[in-house]
Amino acid sequence: MKIDNTIAAVVTGGASGLGRASAQALAAAGVKVAIFDISEEAGEALASEIGGIFCNVDIMSEESCEAGFAKARAAHGQERVVVHCAVVASGGKTVGFDKSTGDYKRAPTAGIETAALGIFVASYRVASIAALGMANAATLNDDDERGCIILTSSAASQDGQIGQVAYGGGKGAVNSMVLPMARDLMDLGIRVNAILPGTFATPPMLGVKEHAPAVFAGLEASVPFPKRLGKPEEFGSLVMELVRNAYFNGQLIRLDGAIRMPPK
C-alpha cells in the first residue's frame, strides 16, 4: 500500500506506548490518523501534535467502538489502516499461596473472562468493524488491496510467564485468529497481521526503571541483542513496513531482540 496523505488510519491505544509510536510514524508519512483511547488529555495532546483527531473510545464497548469509527470516518474518510494496540487484561497464578489467609487460592475465573474480552474479543471487534468499512471501499492498487489490519499480540503468547495465564492465553487467541481472519478477508483485499513485541520501553516499563532500577537492568540484560528494551519507534517502524509491503499477510512477527521469556 502506498503511504501518503490520501490514506486514513485508526490506532487504538494510540495515546501512549506502542500505539503512540505507531500514530507518530503514520502521521510523519502524511497519513490522517485517528487516535482511539480512553486517556483523553494525552490523546488530545498527541492528536494536536501530529495533526490527527482523538476519539474517546472504550474497546470493551461495541457502541463506543462503532461511534469512534463513525467519528474518524466523518473526519478522514474510510480508514485503510488499523493498528490495534489497546488492551484490557488481568494477571494472577492459576493456584497460588495467599499469605493473608495461610491457604492456597486460585485466580478467579472473572480475570480470565476480562482478558478474553479485553484482548481477544476486543481485537475481533476492532478488526471486524474496520473490515466491514473497508469492504465497501474502492481498491487502492493493482493488487486490489483495500486495507491492512495490524493486531498487537505479545511474546507472552508463546513464552507465557508465571501469572500470565489470562494475558498469555488472550494474546495466544489473537495469534490463532490472524490466519483464519486473513483468509476470511482475502477476497476483499484486506490483509491481517500481528506483531508480537517483547519487552519494550513503554510507560509501565519505564516506571519499573524509576522504582526498581535493578529489576529494570536485569530486564535489559535478559535480551540477547541488542541488550536493551525495545524502543517504541522500532515497533512503529515495523507497522510502517507491514502497511507498505503487501506480501505480509496472515503473519505473526516477533519483535523482541531474540528474547525467550523465562518462567519469571
Which sequence ranges carry the predicted segments?
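Rossmann-fold cofactor-recognition segment
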Residues: E49-E63
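C-terminal substrate-recognition "lid" of short-chain dehydrogenase/reductases
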Residues: R228-L255, R260
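Rossmann-fold scaffold of SDR-type NAD(P)-dependent oxidoreductases
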Residues: T12-G13, E79-G96, A127, L151, ...
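Short, flexible catalytic-loop segment of classical short-chain dehydrogenase/reductase
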Residues: L196-G207
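Catalytic Tyr-x(3-8)-Lys segment
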Residues: I112, A212-E233
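Canonical Rossmann dinucleotide-binding motif of NAD(H)/NADP(H)-dependent dehydrogenases/reductases
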Residues: K2-V33
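Short, small/polar-rich loop/turn modules that mediate ligand/substrate recognition or access, typified
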Residues: R146, M186, R191, F248-Q251
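Catalytic loop of short-chain dehydrogenase/reductase
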Residues: S100-G118, S123-V126, L140-A173, V178-D187, ...
